[in-house]
């Protein structure tokens, strides 16, 4: 598709779609809780729809009523062996978390994904789940999908130190641990997003978080809840950056989830000189509205414990850095290489093709700014965040056109992205 270029100031108010991480977990926990769980504000992107379809195939009744998702949970014992292969589409979250959940079920299942998901390593969940007594295997020593899993009704608790910072691996182990008899401990390398821990407790589960150590004694039963999903900060990030780098812009981003394990991007942009104001902050619900205006920015260093708190925002932060004065250095982000694409390489190649000055490193990028961006032929490579980053970059282009292939990937997390973009350009 041909992207909008040479945009004037962006003006207006955006209600970003529901948080993807919380939407997945609301469906997963609701499916094994006892009773009727109702979810408001659910993200209806393709990844979450993959999770919903998987649980329908596992015998859970899920339907939409009055703009809510209603899940009829029957407890952990209520899942039934699927008649077909579980297709997770492009969703690594679905595959890893549901594999953890199915670890304690007395049946076997085959899990597949699309071409992109089939290139993402599952060894990170295979090894701890095997230690718990699950028969699980993928292709090659990296355990690429498809995954074959035979659950075990007598799961063993484990103490497991995560070799990488990964909320998905932590979550897979905790979902299995809810069905294991005894004490499971997970020790994190760096603290990652904690939605699974918070939501297990919201559904009546018990666990103890002590710094980087999470302790859960199983087995446990969960109770149905009413869940309201806040707006996704990872989706809001695209408008946050657009407002900061397009001269004359002023945007209000409403109802954005600001769980502290996800707010790394806000700390980074403020350090770079961003003018942002928080309005209607609700600390208990961890939501706020964010007012953002065009700002002159300076380069910064992003590394260490900050990385897991903004891992999904790094592509759009890279674009931001191309417009900042000086050098921005992103380190300790090797996890980007095994996302939907090798995001270090794809971000570097895409933005450099438009005139940026970025050097890829083994674990990050060195970005020199400010640079003028020009037209180019680009692709999402099937990665939603690359697509949205490119669409925001195109707004800065004064000369030439920007063409984007495989734009349908954006449906993964933000089905109304282009509609919202047009509205902000015209408001």
Curated annotation (Swiss-Prot):
<dbReference type="InterPro" id="IPR036968">
    <property type="entry name" value="Enolpyruvate_Tfrase_sf"/>
</dbReference>
<feature type="binding site">
    <location>
        <position position="343"/>
    </location>
    <ligand>
        <name>phosphoenolpyruvate</name>
    </ligand>
</feature>
<feature type="binding site">
    <location>
        <position position="21"/>
    </location>
    <ligand>
        <name>3-phosphoshikimate</name>
    </ligand>
</feature>
<feature type="binding site">
    <location>
        <position position="92"/>
    </location>
    <ligand>
        <name>phosphoenolpyruvate</name>
    </ligand>
</feature>
<feature type="binding site">
    <location>
        <position position="339"/>
    </location>
    <ligand>
        <name>3-phosphoshikimate</name>
    </ligand>
</feature>
<dbReference type="GO" id="GO:0003866">
    <property type="term" value="F:3-phosphoshikimate 1-carboxyvinyltransferase activity"/>
</dbReference>
<dbReference type="GO" id="GO:0008652">
    <property type="term" value="P:amino acid biosynthetic process"/>
</dbReference>
<keyword id="KW-0963">Cytoplasm</keyword>
<protein>
    <recommendedName>
        <fullName>3-phosphoshikimate 1-carboxyvinyltransferase</fullName>
        <ecNumber>2.5.1.19</ecNumber>
    </recommendedName>
</protein>
<comment type="similarity">
    <text>Belongs to the EPSP synthase family.</text>
</comment>
<feature type="binding site">
    <location>
        <position position="120"/>
    </location>
    <ligand>
        <name>phosphoenolpyruvate</name>
    </ligand>
</feature>
<keyword id="KW-0808">Transferase</keyword>
<feature type="binding site">
    <location>
        <position position="168"/>
    </location>
    <ligand>
        <name>3-phosphoshikimate</name>
    </ligand>
</feature>
<feature type="binding site">
    <location>
        <position position="25"/>
    </location>
    <ligand>
        <name>3-phosphoshikimate</name>
    </ligand>
</feature>
<comment type="pathway">
    <text>Metabolic intermediate biosynthesis; chorismate biosynthesis; chorismate from D-erythrose 4-phosphate and phosphoenolpyruvate: step 6/7.</text>
</comment>
<keyword id="KW-0028">Amino-acid biosynthesis</keyword>
<dbReference type="Pfam" id="PF00275">
    <property type="entry name" value="EPSP_synthase"/>
</dbReference>
<comment type="subunit">
    <text>Monomer.</text>
</comment>
<feature type="active site" description="Proton acceptor">
    <location>
        <position position="312"/>
    </location>
</feature>
<feature type="binding site">
    <location>
        <position position="168"/>
    </location>
    <ligand>
        <name>phosphoenolpyruvate</name>
    </ligand>
</feature>
<dbReference type="GO" id="GO:0009423">
    <property type="term" value="P:chorismate biosynthetic process"/>
</dbReference>
<keyword id="KW-0057">Aromatic amino acid biosynthesis</keyword>
<dbReference type="InterPro" id="IPR023193">
    <property type="entry name" value="EPSP_synthase_CS"/>
</dbReference>
<feature type="binding site">
    <location>
        <position position="20"/>
    </location>
    <ligand>
        <name>phosphoenolpyruvate</name>
    </ligand>
</feature>
<feature type="binding site">
    <location>
        <position position="385"/>
    </location>
    <ligand>
        <name>phosphoenolpyruvate</name>
    </ligand>
</feature>
<dbReference type="InterPro" id="IPR001986">
    <property type="entry name" value="Enolpyruvate_Tfrase_dom"/>
</dbReference>
<dbReference type="InterPro" id="IPR006264">
    <property type="entry name" value="EPSP_synthase"/>
</dbReference>
<comment type="function">
    <text>Catalyzes the transfer of the enolpyruvyl moiety of phosphoenolpyruvate (PEP) to the 5-hydroxyl of shikimate-3-phosphate (S3P) to produce enolpyruvyl shikimate-3-phosphate and inorganic phosphate.</text>
</comment>
<dbReference type="GO" id="GO:0005737">
    <property type="term" value="C:cytoplasm"/>
</dbReference>
<dbReference type="GO" id="GO:0009073">
    <property type="term" value="P:aromatic amino acid family biosynthetic process"/>
</dbReference>
<feature type="binding site">
    <location>
        <position position="166"/>
    </location>
    <ligand>
        <name>3-phosphoshikimate</name>
    </ligand>
</feature>
<feature type="binding site">
    <location>
        <position position="312"/>
    </location>
    <ligand>
        <name>3-phosphoshikimate</name>
    </ligand>
</feature>
<feature type="binding site">
    <location>
        <position position="20"/>
    </location>
    <ligand>
        <name>3-phosphoshikimate</name>
    </ligand>
</feature>
<dbReference type="InterPro" id="IPR013792">
    <property type="entry name" value="RNA3'P_cycl/enolpyr_Trfase_a/b"/>
</dbReference>
